[in-house]
């Protein structure tokens, strides 16, 4: 009886203690809406409803480069902050438990490993597979080029057939799947632009929405069962079967990731599912990112505006007149790809990290240990002091030597530091080879049947075209 009489007082004392702790925290003195000193529920609401990226961007526009998102989370939007968070000590601060959502087959992978020391150890035996020297090998480039030809042939067949248009969202994600599996598994890669089963594999990987269930698992594990019932996560039997079977096949090509992983598994004691888990993680990471970035870019180049048609014309001119020049030595192509990654970064959202023991000073503010800190590419890439007219697609900005260092410091499409995107060189090679194949010989325009929403829609860590469809017409010009 006495316990129940005293319970309200215990609750009141606990609430008051928590309130005092939050008000005394250095985080409470940072810029941001007043409610964020007390709760992160508004942030979680926007995340649950696909709006976290735009919510944070709006806060930065109002409050400046340092914004409190909640009692224990802060967002930054400067090059110095990004350097401190993601590059200090070589690989920046440790990842937060958020990345535990990305385990595969119950096994932690390079991406989902939290402590940077463990990540550094794992990266040592994988990094050379994604080094530019490996990606530039003829065996890899020839394979990607063939997949680019498959993409263009499929699009031309559809345009000159009964459809009269090509849905490049589908074909680009097929191309991205084929490109990444070529590097992962050759000679056991996919041919999704030619093979119906591989097409279904791509659809399983790309046509799903697991944001709500993942957010529930992370923030409210006790509620995840209810959310799973309302919005069940989509199973992935085809991709799981493909990865499990393929990762056990013998004699993969020496340049492949599978070759390196199998050799490592023989030389050391690895977890039972370590090889397929790592392969599945790289497979999932390499499809939507490259496919979405190319889709946003080709849609923009095909818009019926003078600005878009000018860029497409200049790109065609450089590619058509320099057929024998290596793709990595074409300045305008490079500028178009960089501007695409600035305007449509494959992962535009926050990359959360945890402030280490003892706390840190970021942008002149002391941030206590355990605080979640992050930057998001979407906001960094729109700094008007570094990128004048940030909402305009201007490849020429990357050809200007003035301000080059500042632009590169804020370029965050692949994150930065030792934990930045391992596959950046592969992604850029895929984008450039695909664009060269298409725009050296074709012109693209929007189909009259193109009515899909091309706004960015946030997923758990990446964003994609909301309508997941982009209908273009391809016309041969040579």
Language-model features and meaning:
Residues 190, 306-307, 406, 424-465:
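Cytochrome P450 heme-binding "Cys pocket" and the immediately downstream C-terminal segment
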Residues 2, 14, 463-478:
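C-terminal helix/juxtamembrane-tail motif
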Residues 176, 180, 264-316, 340, ...:
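Central I-helix of cytochrome P450 enzymes
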Residues 340, 367-370, 393, 417, ...:
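Hydrophobic, well-ordered secondary-structure elements that form the walls
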Residues 46-56, 321-363:
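Conserved cytochrome P450 K-helix E-x-x-R motif and the immediately C-terminal K′/meander segment
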Residues 320, 375-402:
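Conserved cytochrome P450 K-helix/beta-meander segment immediately N-terminal to the heme-binding cysteine loop
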Residues 2-121, 145-150, 353, 358, ...:
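N-terminal membrane-proximal hinge/A-helix region immediately C-terminal to the signal-anchor transmembrane segment
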Residues 93-103, 137-294:
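Cytochrome P450 heme-thiolate monooxygenase catalytic core
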């Amino acid at each position: 009886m006495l316990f129940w009489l005293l319970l309200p007082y215990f609750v009141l004392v606990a609430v008051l203690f928590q309130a005092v702790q939050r008000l005394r925290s250095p985080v409470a003195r940072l810029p941001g809406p007043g409610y964020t000193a007390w709760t992160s529920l508004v942030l979680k609401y926007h995340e649950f409803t696909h709006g976290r990226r735009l919510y944070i961007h709006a806060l930065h526009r109002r409050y400046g480069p340092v914004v409190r998102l909640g009692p224990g989370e802060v967002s930054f939007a400067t090059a110095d902050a990004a350097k401190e968070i993601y590059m200090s000590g070589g690989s920046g601060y440790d990842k937060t438990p958020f990345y535990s959502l990305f385990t595969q087959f119950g096994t932690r992978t390079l991406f989902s490993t939290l402590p940077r020391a463990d990540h550094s150890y794992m990266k040592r035996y994988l990094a050379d597979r994604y080094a530019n020297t490996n990606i530039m090998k003829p065996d890899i480039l020839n394979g990607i080029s063939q997949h680019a030809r498959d993409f263009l042939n499929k699009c031309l067949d559809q345009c000159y057939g009964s459809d009269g248009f090509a849905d490049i969202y589908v074909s680009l994600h097929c191309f991205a799947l084929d490109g990444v599996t070529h590097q992962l598994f050759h000679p056991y890669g996919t041919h999704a632009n030619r093979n119906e089963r591989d097409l279904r594999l791509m659809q399983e990987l790309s046509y799903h929405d697991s944001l709500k269930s993942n957010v529930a698992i992370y923030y409210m594990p006790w509620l995840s069962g209810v959310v799973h019932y309302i919005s069940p996560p989509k199973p992935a039997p085809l991709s799981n079967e493909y990865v499990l079977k393929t990762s056990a096949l013998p004699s993969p090509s020496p340049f492949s990731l599978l070759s390196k992983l199998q050799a490592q598994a023989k030389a050391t004691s690895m977890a039972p599912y370590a090889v397929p888990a790592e392969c599945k993680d790289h497979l999932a990471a390499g499809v939507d990112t490259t496919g979405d970035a190319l889709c946003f870019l080709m849609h923009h180049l095909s818009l019926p505006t003078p600005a878009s048609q000018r860029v497409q014309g200049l790109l065609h001119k450089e590619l058509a007149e320099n057929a024998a020049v290596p793709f990595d030595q074409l300045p305008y192509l490079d500028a178009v790809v960089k501007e695409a990654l600035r305007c449509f970064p494959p992962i535009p959202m926050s990359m959360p990290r945890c402030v280490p023991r003892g706390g840190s000073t970021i942008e002149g503010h002391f941030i206590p240990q355990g605080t979640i800190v992050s930057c998001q590419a979407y906001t960094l890439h729109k700094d008007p002091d570094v990128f004048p007219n940030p909402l305009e697609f201007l490849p020429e900005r990357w050809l200007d030597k003035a301000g080059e260092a500042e632009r590169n410091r804020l370029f965050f499409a692949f994150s930065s530091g030792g934990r930045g995107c391992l596959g950046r060189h592969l992604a850029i090679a895929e984008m450039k080879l695909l664009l060269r194949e298409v725009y050296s010989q074709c012109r693209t325009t929007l189909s009259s049947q193109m009515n899909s929403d091309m706004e960015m829609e946030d997923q758990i860590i990446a964003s994609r075209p909301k309508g997941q469809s982009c209908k273009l017409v391809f016309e041969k010009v040579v």
